[in-house]
Design a protein with these regions (language model features):
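Dinucleotide-binding Rossmann-like beta1-alpha1 core, especially the glycine-rich loop
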Residues: 46-126, 250-251
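Conserved Rossmann-like nucleotide-cofactor binding loop
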Residues: 12, 35, 203
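Glycine-rich FAD pyrophosphate-binding loop
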Residues: 22-42
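Short Gly/Ser/Thr- and Asp/Glu-enriched loop/turn motifs at secondary-structure junctions
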Residues: 43, 83-87, 179, 221-223
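Short beta-strand to alpha-helix junction loop
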Residues: 62-65, 90-99, 138-157, 276-284
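N-terminal Rossmann-like FAD-binding beta1-loop-alpha1 element of flavoenzymes
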Residues: 2-28
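Helical element adjacent to the flavin cofactor pocket in flavoenzyme catalytic cores
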Residues: 138-195
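Active-site substrate-recognition segment that forms the wall
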Residues: 15-22, 48, 78-83, 190, ...
Length: 294
């Protein structure tokens, strides 16, 4: 019997597996795909958020700030690219300045250091190519960018060296409670474990609902991006956000650790969790909204 099974070979699954590998226990990662980082971990904004927008007092706020502080040491230990390029939240209308101040207050409450509101000539000093329509920005210098693929692979490699077993092409079909813990059923047989960590991304609700009386439903939200050539990579140096809405942080513009320029994402609720296509309308939306920033 295993002590812990982790379902999902993404960044959350392998961050968990690496931590478990520090202890004297038997752990395994189960993944339906043929390799690591095949889900959401391979397709995201690659941002290490500073932590100014999470509601103070929540687990998200605490984990965001704590995780941000870990990144310098973690990237050095595992040798993956990470850069603290800082982030800016743009305000285009003076009537929305109270919203920017609210984010600053949240940052202070969450323990995010050195966050301040910048206006006037200092905006252009930070980012010369920002739109002249920007009235003020929230500047969070601890924001960063990372390579999500190399980070996930590095976590996986370190987990494996430390004794965690990997089972790829092993789709979990059901989970049964037992007297000792859980029996995880897969297309390649059953795995018994005392504990199961559910790190299955957009499919986490399905595995939760197999064993928990508290049912969950995850509505998948698709985002489309445009990744530009390295010739455009230095157009901005910070990660540029527009003021957030209930749907998220909106269309961002950011350099990548590889020297490209990334813009996006859209935010579209969908029914098919496997739908990852891009569309002409979606990419046009990215271009139109990104142009508001710079």
């Amino acid at each position: 019997m295993l002590d812990v099974i982790v379902i999902g070979a993404g960044v959350t699954g392998f961050a968990t597996a690496r931590e478990l590998s520090r202890y004297d226990l038997k752990a395994a990662v189960l993944e339906r795909e043929e390799d690591v980082c095949c889900g959401t971990s391979k397709a995201n904004s690659a941002i290490i958020h500073a932590g100014y927008d999470a509601e103070p007092g929540t687990l998200k706020a605490r984990m965001n700030v704590q995780g941000n502080r870990m990144m310098d040491a973690l990237s050095k230990e595992l040798d993956f690219p990470f850069k603290r390029n800082g982030s800016l939240v743009l305000c285009f209308d003076e009537d929305n300045l109270p919203g920017l101040e609210e984010l600053r207050e949240r940052a202070e409450a969450n323990g995010v250091p050195d966050v301040r509101i910048v206006a006037g000539d200092e905006i252009k000093a930070l980012e010369p190519n920002l739109s002249p329509d920007v009235k003020a920005v929230l500047y969070a210098p601890t924001g960063g960018i990372v390579c999500p693929f190399k980070m996930t692979i590095a976590l996986a490699e370190n987990s494996y060296v430390n004794g965690v077993d990997f089972h790829f092409n092993t789709e979990v079909t059901d989970i049964t409670r037992t007297a000792e813990g859980y029996l995880v059923h897969t297309a390649k047989g059953d795995f018994a474990a005392r504990c199961v960590v559910n790190a299955a991304g957009v499919y986490a609700d399905q595995f939760n609902n197999m064993v928990s009386a508290h049912k969950l439903h995850i509505t998948p939200r698709k985002g489309e991006y445009i990744l530009m050539d390295k010739k455009a990579g230095d157009f901005v140096t910070h990660t540029i956000f527009q003021q957030p809405t209930r749907l998220g942080k909106g269309i961002l513009v950011t350099p990548t650790v590889h020297g490209n320029l990334l813009a996006g994402p859209t935010a579209e609720d969908i029914t098919d969790k496997e739908e990852v296509c891009t569309t002409g309308d979606g990419l046009a939306q990215v271009v139109d909204k990104a142009r508001l920033s710079a």
